[in-house]
């Protein structure tokens, strides 16, 4: 197990993975640092309120993939999203959003200016509702949702590396 081999653990993830690491940080205060990237804690899509019904009527919908500005870059992704899975994801957003105040670890929130998937208000919401006194938001001006594959990918790596290095000392 990684925790047994390291003095400090930091976690980072993109999109729904970012939501999952926020949830993880809420329940594991021993995590040294948290780096969500374009992490949703709510969605503004008008279909969200009817997901509990839709999931029984429609098995899946076209997936969102390759929200990337840099030409020629394609994100490997599924072509469909199960509606039951989307419903569970929205429930996770609610639980995670409710408990953001439990996060006291150092926090580096990253978001992209041209994200067409996650509402831009999520990053400031995370910043405002977490208890961490050591938090920073980095905005990437040239990328869309999949910033880790887009123009600003090196900036993501550099920002995360500097954050983790700072926490290591």
Predicted feature locations:
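Gly/Ala-rich beta-loop-alpha elbow adjacent to hydrolase catalytic centers
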Residues: 13-17, 21
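Catalytic histidine neighborhood in serine/cysteine hydrolases
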Residues: 124, 128-146
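Active-site nucleophile loop of the alpha/beta-hydrolase fold
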Residues: 19, 35-45
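Catalytic active-site module of serine/aspartate enzymes centered on a nucleophile-bearing elbow/loop
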Residues: 141-169
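Active-site nucleophile elbow and catalytic-triad environment of alpha/beta-hydrolase enzymes
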Residues: 82-99, 105
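Short beta-strand/loop motif that positions the catalytic acidic residue
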Residues: 103, 109-111, 115
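Conserved alpha/beta-hydrolase "acid-adjacent" motif
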Residues: 116-122
């Amino acid at each position: 197990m990684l925790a047994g081999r390291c003095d400090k653990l930091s976690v980072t993830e993109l999109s729904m993975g970012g939501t999952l690491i926020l949830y993880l940080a809420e329940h594991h205060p021993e995590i040294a640092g948290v780096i969500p990237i374009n992490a949703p804690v709510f969605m503004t899509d008008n279909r969200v309120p009817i997901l509990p019904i839709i999931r029984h009527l429609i098995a899946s919908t076209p997936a969102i993939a390759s929200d990337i500005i840099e030409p020629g870059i394609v994100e490997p992704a599924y072509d469909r999203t199960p509606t039951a899975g989307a419903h569970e994801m929205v429930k996770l957003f609610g639980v995670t959003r409710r408990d953001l105040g439990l996060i006291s670890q150092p926090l580096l929130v990253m978001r992209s200016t041209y994200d067409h998937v996650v509402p831009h208000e999520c990053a400031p919401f995370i910043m405002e509702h977490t208890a961490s006194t050591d938090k920073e938001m980095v905005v990437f001006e040239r990328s869309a949702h999949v910033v880790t594959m887009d123009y600003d990918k090196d900036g993501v790596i550099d920002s995360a590396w500097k954050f983790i290095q700072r926490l290591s000392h």
